Design a protein with these regions (language model features):
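Sec-dependent bacterial lipoprotein signal peptides
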Residues: 1-27
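N-terminal edge beta-strand
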Residues: 51-81
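Extracellular/periplasmic metallocenter environments
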Residues: 27, 31-33, 46, 53, ...
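Solvent-exposed coil/turn segments that connect beta secondary-structure elements
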Residues: 64-66, 88-90, 101-102, 127-129, ...
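Beta-strand cores of secreted/periplasmic/IMS beta-sandwich domains, seen most often
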Residues: 72-92, 120-128, 132
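Beta-strand signatures of extracellular beta-sandwich domains
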Residues: 95-99
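Surface-exposed loop/edge segments in extracytoplasmic proteins
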Residues: 104-111
Length: 152
């Protein structure tokens, strides 16, 4: 076989091997799904309401790239609440606010921006029992909302 014909015959194989090697290399560099997610906390599961030593109720919500809060519902007693939102998404920025007009009383604190990998905490006081809607206002139409119930 003449050298030019051999180059044509071998060229596509070398290209395919090179592409396959690049894919394997890049896949190895990309890491697994858990390495890119926010590190799990050693505290209670998301949505579990606990009472801190200072008497404030604490709850953590988590969100990812799937446009939901985990959990999307939790219950607290009237009083002070410390709410942490963890954005475990790889790509999506979220926010958190209590839906204006969706509850017995207004809750003002909000988290305007929460980039992937960030966690932010707000504190507020609720005195009136009832259901309070919350949302990511960027993704409400995609179903990213939930309910905090104040019971007691």
């Amino acid at each position: 076989m003449p050298p030019a014909a051999r180059r044509l015959a071998v060229g596509p194989c070398k290209k395919a091997a090179g592409v396959a090697a690049a894919v394997v290399l890049l896949t190895g560099c990309g890491g697994g799904g858990t390495a890119e997610q926010a590190a799990p906390s050693s505290g209670p599961a998301p949505g579990t309401v606990t009472t801190a030593p200072d008497g404030v109720q604490e709850v953590t919500l988590q969100t990812q790239d799937d446009y939901v809060f985990t959990p999307d519902a939790f219950t607290v007693a009237p009083g002070e609440v410390r709410l942490t939102v963890v954005n475990a998404a790889r790509q999506t920025t979220h926010n958190f606010r209590f839906t204006p007009g969706d509850g017995p009383e207004a809750i003002q604190p909000e988290i305007p921006l929460l980039a992937p990998g960030e966690r932010r905490t707000i504190e507020f006081t609720v005195t009136v029992p009832g259901a309070y809607g919350f949302e990511c206002s960027f993704h409400t139409q995609l179903g990213q909302f939930g309910t905090m119930t104040v019971s007691g």
